Structures are given as structure tokens and as C-alpha cells.
Regions:
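P-loop NTPase motor core
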Residues: 85, 90-170
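Conserved GTP-binding G-domain of TRAFAC-class P-loop NTPases and closely related GTPase folds
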Residues: 130, 146-232
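A short linear-motif detector with a strong N-terminal bias
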Residues: 10, 17-20, 36, 118-119, ...
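Short, well-ordered beta-strand core segments
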Residues: 38-40, 138, 179-181
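Structured loop/turn residues at beta-strand edges in well-structured enzyme cores
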Residues: 81, 134, 174
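Conserved P-loop
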Residues: 2-88, 92-97
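Residues that form or immediately flank small-molecule/cofactor binding pockets and catalytic motifs
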Residues: 45, 62-64, 143, 184, ...
Length: 232
């Protein structure tokens, strides 16, 4: 057995955070507010919005995601020294690129085959698990979508959550410390992140007691007061 004491463990060390929202809401730009040196892996090649910042970006060939992910997971452990944060920018885009790649490699050259769907479930969880084992803080972004859920009372709702196939979405969100929906307040034009979920929005926060946060202070863990996210 490998027993270790949790007495001096800080639950915010090596955090794993996902923020999701509609395209253009500012998910990638949230990397500006991470503390320490940051490396971005741009699955959707949108890293140019971070131009002028002291943030590094890895090149990613979205036409060949399987090969690129194999390369990254082999090379990253050797280049992360000095980095505090890793940003996996847009796993929704990664999912789409992977299925396009599989369709291209199919017998028809375009259509996905049945085994692709079960293959993605195993592949994606293994990839995320490998990323999550890296000794840095990790921020993941995704697009949003609405999915039908059934409450404990039997009522059905459409709930916003990260745009990923159902076969991986729940497991992925379970592995992640914080899942928040980024929103824009139409009155103030300020961006915030919802950190407490309900029937209409999936969100969770197991790092502190905040239910919402302005994007600028999202990574200031330990705040006991619920700040106005300016997103409701």
C-alpha cells in the first residue's frame, strides 16, 4: 500500500479547471489571468487572441490530432519545467477534429464507422487522464451546448454543459475540480463564470465556496465571499 498524509496538502495545488461557453465569449483569453508562466495547446488554432501576452503556444496540427496528441504527451513532460499552467484550448474542437480524421481514414473516406464512437470514449478519457497527471495547473476550454436531463422528480430540462459526446462528458467533468459556464452580462458587458449548477446549467466548484466569479479573479482560490460574476 502507498499511504500518504493529507495534513499538509493544499487542495488548490495542481488544479484542473474547465470553462465552457459560446464561441467568442472569451474562453481562450481567460488564460491571461492565470498566475505564473503559461503554455497553451490550441486545439482550434485560436491562440492569436493572446497576442502581446507573456504566454507561449505549442503548434497543433488539427488535421492529424491522433499523431499530434501522441507527440504532445511524449514531449510535454520534458518541456514543462518552468511552467505553472497548461491550457488545453477547446476540447470540443478536438473532438470534432478527431472524428473528421477517423472518417477520412474509413473505407468510405468520409463517414465515421460504428467503432469510432466507442473508440473515442476510451481514447479521450485516456488522453485527458494523461494530461491531468502532468505536474502543472490545467485549464481546459470547451464550447457549450444544451442537453436534455431528467431531474430526481422526473421533470425534464435542457441543461447547458460542455459540448462533448455524452459518453465522455460526465466522466471528464467528474475528473475536473471546477467546471464553470462563462457568460456575458448584457448590461455591464462584463464576463463572469457561473460556479454553482442547477437544472439549467452544469457547474461545480470543489476548490472554494464561490458560486460565481468575474473572469479576472476566477483563479484567486480561497475567496469565501460570493462575488458578483456580472453574468446573470
Amino acid at each position: 500500500m502507498a499511504i500518504h498524509s493529507l495534513k499538509d496538502t493544499n487542495k488548490t495545488d495542481l488544479f484542473r479547471v474547465m470553462i465552457y461557453g459560446k464561441p467568442g465569449i472569451g474562453k481562450t483569453s481567460a488564460a491571461r489571468f492565470l498566475k505564473g508562466k503559461t503554455l497553451v495547446v490550441p486545439f482550434d488554432n485560436s491562440e492569436k487572441v493572446l497576442s502581446g501576452t507573456n504566454i507561449d503556444a505549442e503548434e497543433f496540427d488539427k488535421a492529424n490530432p491522433s499523431k499530434e496528441l501522441t507527440r504532445l504527451l511524449k514531449e510535454l513532460p520534458g518541456v514543462l519545467d518552468g511552467y505553472s499552467n497548461l491550457v488545453l484550448d477547446n476540447v470540443s474542437s478536438l473532438e470534432k477534429s478527431w472524428f473528421i480524421e477517423q472518417g477520412r481514414n474509413s473505407k468510405s473516406g468520409i463517414r465515421n464507422e460504428l467503432q469510432d464512437y466507442s473508440g473515442w470514449t476510451n481514447y479521450f478519457i485516456r488522453v485527458i487522464d494523461a494530461f491531468y497527471k502532468l505536474p502543472v495547473n490545467i485549464l481546459v476550454t470547451a464550447w457549450e451546448d444544451q442537453y436534455e436531463i431528467t431531474s430526481m422528480t422526473g421533470q425534464q430540462f435542457n441543461q447547458y454543459s460542455p459540448q462533448l459526446r455524452a459518453s465522455v462528458r460526465s466522466t471528464f467533468m467528474g475528473l475536473t475540480d471546477v467546471v464553470g459556464r462563462m457568460m456575458l452580462n448584457p448590461d455591464t458587458q462584463k464576463r463572469g463564470v457561473i460556479l454553482e449548477g442547477d437544472d439549467g446549467i452544469f457547474a461545480k466548484n470543489r476548490l472554494d465556496s464561490r458560486k460565481a466569479s468575474p473572469i479576472e479573479t476566477l483563479f484567486d482560490w480561497g475567496e469565501s465571499d460570493d462575488k458578483d460574476a456580472s453574468a446573470e
